[in-house]
Amino acid sequence: MIGKLKGVIDEIAEDHAVIDVHGVGYVAFCSARTLGNLGGAGEAAILFIETYVREDMIRLYGFATQLEREWFRLLQNVQGVGAKVALAVLGTLSPSELANAIALRDIAMVSRAPGVGKKVAERIVTELKNKAPAFAGEASGTIGLKQELGAGAAPAPVADAVSALSNLGYSRDQAANAVAAALKETGEGADSAKLIRLGLKELSQ
């Protein structure tokens, strides 16, 4: 089994890269995010590999980090999610963004990925809400929110506030941290408008 490739980029295609390792070209299928960060032909590259072996083929999937590879494996535990859909999700959301979306039950965020409808997004959020932290860890903002909310799903005002702050240009982790700080001040009964206002105050400090 191949676990990692270290070589030179020979070609970048729409859904895969060819990595030359001592004269042998390996085709690795990657997410759009990973392909976009690889660089160009002739540049050095390292990919962490998930190897699929079937009777009629061997296919390699490549990832920029081991964390991304763990998410790829985890996503395919969800009914209706195969390798193609898992790559689409990882091409749309970074591991920290995906962790935040699952923690906040942000189905709309997950469904942004091509080929992921509302039902599949709901299954991803529901089936991975307890497994995801153990496999991949979480962004600090997600941890802060879980500490404030406990084990349950985030209420709609919390998810709306994080989404609104993200739409203003802040990262999902920054937004989640700010909303977690706002919750410390207001408690769980605050509406989204108040959480957004206090979140912006926190981010401006």
From Swiss-Prot:
Q: Where is this region: Flexible linker?
A: 144-152
Q: Which GO terms describe its biological process?
A: DNA recombination; DNA repair
- Subunit details: Homotetramer. Forms an RuvA(8)-RuvB(12)-Holliday junction (HJ) complex. HJ DNA is sandwiched between 2 RuvA tetramers; dsDNA enters through RuvA and exits via RuvB. An RuvB hexamer assembles on each DNA strand where it exits the tetramer. Each RuvB hexamer is contacted by two RuvA subunits (via domain III) on 2 adjacent RuvB subunits; this complex drives branch migration. In the full resolvosome a probable DNA-RuvA(4)-RuvB(12)-RuvC(2) complex forms which resolves the HJ.
Q: Which GO terms describe its molecular function?
A: ATP binding; four-way junction DNA binding; four-way junction helicase activity
Name the UniProt record assigns to this protein: Holliday junction branch migration complex subunit RuvA
Q: Which Pfam families match?
A: HHH_5, RuvA_C, RuvA_N
Where is it predominantly found? Answer: cytoplasm
Query: InterPro entries from the xrefs?
Result: DNA_helicase_Holl-junc_RuvA_I, Hlx-hairpin-Hlx_DNA-bd_motif, NA-bd_OB-fold, RuvA, RuvA_2-like, RuvA_C, RuvA_C_sf
Chain positions covered by the region annotation Domain III: 153-205
In which organism is this protein found?
Brucella canis (strain ATCC 23365 / NCTC 10854 / RM-666)
Q: Which family does it belong to?
A: Belongs to the RuvA family.
Q: What is known of its domains?
A: Has three domains with a flexible linker between the domains II and III and assumes an 'L' shape. Domain III is highly mobile and contacts RuvB.
Residues covered by region (Domain II)? 65-143
